[in-house]
Amino acid sequence: MAGPRRSWRNSFYMKEQRHRILCAVCALALVLTAVLAPAAWAADGAGEVQDTAKSALTTGDAAEMQQADAAVTALTGSDEYEQMSREERLASALAELDELARKGLVRRDSIRTDEENGMVSFTYRCGVLGGILLTLPDELDEMTFDAGDNGLRAPRDMAQCTPRTEMPLTDDVRQAAEARQYRENALPETIGRAAIYYAFDNTVNSSRFPYYSYMQGFWEGMGLRTTMNTRVTLSDLRRMNKYDLCILSAHGAYYTYSYGTFRKHTRTEPIILLTEASTLYKDIIYGFDLLAHRIIKLNGLYCVTADFFRNAYRSGQLSNTIIYSETCEFLGVTNSVDESMAEALLAGGARTVLGYVNNVYTVYSRSMLWDTVNHLAMGQTIGRALAHAKDTYGENDIIWYTEQGGRRPHAAAAYLVLYGDENARLNVPENFSLEERAEAAEDMLADVLESAA
């Protein structure tokens, strides 16, 4: 029996040795990870670090970002930067980011120039995305009809326009306003609630804001209770479900960034720019969204991606809301249409979403908004209201531009696209039939007829 016993013992011994070797290998791997990972994270502006998302943003992370933001805003907010050419701004931005990478505040290999979309993108050391705009938001209005580098020529008499002259009443709207004086009780006092999320500028000395203030008052007179939000925050954009109609009046851009540890990839997506400035406290509060790239920081200001809306309304809270976006490149650009914004809002419960492909002319955009909402408030479906606006101002902004006498339009026409239910409309009481609404639609604008004439 000695032979079999010895064989069994040898077999047991060999298995035990293999088990010990495996344990030793695992232990060595853990030691190497513990020793080498922190060293990699500390590399000079590395960029190959922390590509796996952190679970939370620490106070230290936020403090480092604020240090970087202070340097970026000191550059972009300076008089010198305002006077620079685009090429000089690019050189200054790259020099500033090189210094921030040397200090370990941004990842050096994340710095990416996107001249087509006018920005330099980068990643903070903690993994949050950032960027520097080469064209300041305040300049975007001027670029619409600037005869300078972008080669545009202003349509005739555009400089003399006011809200009343630029946005006249169409005949059907005017007739409806006149009829209101004689049939005051034909429609419910309130036909819905709307919100204008105005984030083009801070309204001080603004060339845009008077038009939106005018529209707000006009729609109030139509029975559409309209809230004007001129200090739009990320928190505000999480509460759009309170309204029947939400208007996103803000600048938009196409943001390109690099990602990946061993193989670098690039991704481009639409973003909406806000005027809400980044602070240490807010960075911590918004930490999860920042790390998940649902929020991005440009020039020290917060911006949102499609994933922001997808996450904010993941339970479908936008039930039956109509979302109308004026932002440039909300749906991407020609030959690269990106429907992520519309898809995210529809997934969040929105009934209808409208937005632009390409950069859109300022005046065309607000004229389309004006006419669409006027007819939506008269009881028309959003599809019919949009069709009327296109019949009035043109299918795209280049058609409108040339009809105004413009001679050198921009390269790609901007056009408004509707997603979702084209039959969506504002609130109609159950006891108020469509026939009655059609008869009473003429009564809705009387309160503001005199001021709009």
Q: Where are the regions that the model predicts?
A:
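Bacterial N-terminal signal peptides that target proteins for export
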Residues: 15-25
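Cysteine protease catalytic core and zymogen-processing segment of caspase-like enzymes
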Residues: 255-351
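Sec-dependent signal peptide cleavage junction
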Residues: 34-48
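Bacterial N-terminal signal peptides
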Residues: 25-35
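Loop/turn elements at helix/coil->beta-strand transitions in domains of secreted/extracellular proteins
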Residues: 192, 222, 241-245, 317-323, ...
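Non-catalytic propeptide/linker segments at domain boundaries
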Residues: 80-213, 217-218, 256
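Active-site-proximal C-terminal subdomain of hydrolase catalytic domains
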Residues: 322-448, 452
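A domain-level signal for caspase-like cysteine endopeptidase catalytic cores
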Residues: 61, 67-77, 162-283, 287
